[in-house]
């Protein structure tokens, strides 16, 4: 039986804008002599959820409505803000939750996203990224633009300190990162949109290679919310993800979805 991880300080989180702030804590095994997890100091993880409309309405095709209305491009402004404030927020890592663009077949949207994410590439702020349903032709079987603009080579070059590997399949890119915060290493598994059985097997193999690391799973789809504020699984996929992967791994202490 797997040792159960105790991470009480990490289960209560506060989401503020595009940040998640967590108390740092070392993982401790139940029954380990002298193990007494404590809160310690805090650190931040930058979160970029569903930037699709930032990409869409900053293109020439839309007359760059974002610039016209707000005087800036929101996608670019967000990544610049994250880089500029990383030290004061004690932030070593950013994660994108998918839907990088709104219309996968519009070149201009990818150019906007590329320019914004390049700000992270050029900094020492590492990040993970994953495709959402708007980033691909969900009905097609051919490679999609996501692979061109956000390739494994780019991820590796931009994130030399954290990037571990990329699982690449048609319409199903996932990647693994290990980052450190307050002396504790964390494994981030960024799962592509509706990651299939083989992708989940890959993710499980990464966890098995790192049995002592707390795990953060990021995905575009897990839970949903209705107009009355009730939270529920996103179709069958969210429940399957929970039943076949998340609840079977005590190391997973945080799941974020777009």
Where do the PLM segments sit?
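Stable alpha-helical elements in mature extracytoplasmic
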Residues: 71-79, 97, 109-116, 142-146, ...
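His/acidic metal-ligating clusters that form di-metal
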Residues: 80-93, 173, 185-258
């Amino acid at each position: 039986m797997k040792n159960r991880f105790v991470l009480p300080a990490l289960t209560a989180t506060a989401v503020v804008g595009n940040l998640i702030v967590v108390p740092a804590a070392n993982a401790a095994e139940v029954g380990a002599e002298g193990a007494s997890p404590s809160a310690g100091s805090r650190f931040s993880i930058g979160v970029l959820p569903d930037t699709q409309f930032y990409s869409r309405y900053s293109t020439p095709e839309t007359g760059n409505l974002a610039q016209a209305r707000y005087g800036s491009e929101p996608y670019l402004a967000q990544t610049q803000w994250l880089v500029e404030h990383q030290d004061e927020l004690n932030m070593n890592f950013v994660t994108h939750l998918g839907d990088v663009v709104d219309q996968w077949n519009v070149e201009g949207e990818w150019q906007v996203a590329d320019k914004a994410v390049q700000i992270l590439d050029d900094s020492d702020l590492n990040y993970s990224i994953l495709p959402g349903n708007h980033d691909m032709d969900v009905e097609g079987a051919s490679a999609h633009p996501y692979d061109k603009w956000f390739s494994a080579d780019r991820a590796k070059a931009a994130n030399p300190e954290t990037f571990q590997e990329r699982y690449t399949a048609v319409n199903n890119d996932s990647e693994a990162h290990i980052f450190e915060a307050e002396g504790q290493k964390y494994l981030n598994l960024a799962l592509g949109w509706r990651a299939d059985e083989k992708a989940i097997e890959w993710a499980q193999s990464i966890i098995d290679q790192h049995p002592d690391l707390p795990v953060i799973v990021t995905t575009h789809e897990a839970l949903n919310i209705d107009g009355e504020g009730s939270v529920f699984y996103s179709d069958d996929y969210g429940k399957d993800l929970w039943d076949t992967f998340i609840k079977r791994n005590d190391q997973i202490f945080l799941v974020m979805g777009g």
